[in-house]
Curated annotation (Swiss-Prot):
Species per Swiss-Prot/TrEMBL record: Pelomedusa subrufa (African side-necked turtle)
GO cellular component: mitochondrial inner membrane; proton-transporting ATP synthase complex
SUPFAM superfamilies: F1F0 ATP synthase subunit A
Subunit (UniProt): Component of the ATP synthase complex composed at least of ATP5F1A/subunit alpha, ATP5F1B/subunit beta, ATP5MC1/subunit c (homooctomer), MT-ATP6/subunit a, MT-ATP8/subunit 8, ATP5ME/subunit e, ATP5MF/subunit f, ATP5MG/subunit g, ATP5MK/subunit k, ATP5MJ/subunit j, ATP5F1C/subunit gamma, ATP5F1D/subunit delta, ATP5F1E/subunit epsilon, ATP5PF/subunit F6, ATP5PB/subunit b, ATP5PD/subunit d, ATP5PO/subunit OSCP.
InterPro entries: ATP_synth_F0_asu, ATP_synth_F0_asu_bact/mt, F0_ATP_A_sf
Molecular function (Gene Ontology), one example: proton-transporting ATP synthase activity, rotational mechanism
CDD domains: ATP-synt_Fo_a_6
One Pfam family named in its UniProt record: ATP-synt_A
Function: Subunit a, of the mitochondrial membrane ATP synthase complex (F(1)F(0) ATP synthase or Complex V) that produces ATP from ADP in the presence of a proton gradient across the membrane which is generated by electron transport complexes of the respiratory chain. ATP synthase complex consist of a soluble F(1) head domain - the catalytic core - and a membrane F(1) domain - the membrane proton channel. These two domains are linked by a central stalk rotating inside the F(1) region and a stationary peripheral stalk.
The keyword Transmembrane helix is annotated on this UniProt entry: yes
Listed name of the protein: ATP synthase F(0) complex subunit a
Name of the gene: MT-ATP6
Localization of this protein: Mitochondrion inner membrane
Membrane topology of this protein: Multi-pass membrane protein
Family that this chain belongs to: Belongs to the ATPase A chain family.
Length: 228
């Protein structure tokens, strides 16, 4: 069987069932459930506390009219974080490396925030396309530039997380391959293994940061289009 550098991004199957589907279903055992035996579980208590703190900080700069977005933004953050971290396991598929999936999250959420602004405060939303104090000859050019900047926001959200995760996975793939190839030279192989360990820690941080950045940018777009 011929393997290439990009085979790690193909979705593995077992008995024609995608392994990602099985792994996502198994996650339900660690999510909070209304069961007396699990109400005092330490892991669930820590999860609930962390989710509460994150949601509180996320909604802090957003007006009260946008607080009903708390559940969907927190759920999106949890989904992205779980997918990113699971993708670091060997022989797994990371769905968030696919631009189509990330755009599927980014485009509807961005469009929803934009439509909220146009519905509730159309004047303020359109005013963002023209900075205050712009000279008259520059008005058409600046409106065009700001419009393009507005339209590429969902693309930037999707490309950012896909590019960062793909680059990190390729680095880990190359480093792990080098570790195995240098097994005949123990010193170099050990040094490469240490580098792989450090790179794995870095990629775990990147996985968490990218999920956080994705949701934070969406919250900023929501803040721009909601009123007090």
């Amino acid at each position: 069987m011929n393997l290439t550098l990009f085979d790690q991004f193909s979705s593995p199957n077992i008995l024609a069932i995608p392994l990602m589907t099985i792994s996502l279903l198994m996650l339900t055992i660690i999510f909070p459930m209304k069961h007396n035996r699990l109400l005092t579980n330490r892991l669930l208590s820590i999860q609930s506390k962390m989710i509460h703190i994150f949601t509180k900080q996320l909604m802090l700069p957003i007006p009260k009219s946008g607080h009903h977005w708390a559940l969907i933004l927190t759920s999106l953050m949890t989904l992205l974080l779980t997918s990113n971290l699971l993708g670091l396991l060997p022989y797994t598929f990371t769905p968030t490396t696919q631009l189509s999936m990330n755009l599927g999250f980014a485009l509807p959420m961005w469009l929803a925030t934009l439509l909220i602004g146009l519905r509730n405060q159309p004047t303020m939303s359109l005013a963002h396309l023209l900075p205050e104090g712009t000279p008259t000859p520059l008005i058409p050019t600046l409106i065009l530039i700001e419009s393009i900047s507005l339209m590429i926001r969902p693309l930037a959200l999707g490309v950012r997380i896909s590019a960062n995760l793909t680059a990190g996975h390729l680095l880990m793939q190359l480093t792990s391959s080098a570790t195995l190839s240098l097994s005949s030279m123990p010193t170099l192989s050990f040094m490469t293994a240490i580098l792989l360990f450090l790179l794995t820690i870095l990629e775990m941080a990147v996985a968490m940061i990218q999920a956080l950045v994705f949701v934070l940018l969406l919250s900023l777009y929501l803040q721009e289009n909601t009123h007090n």
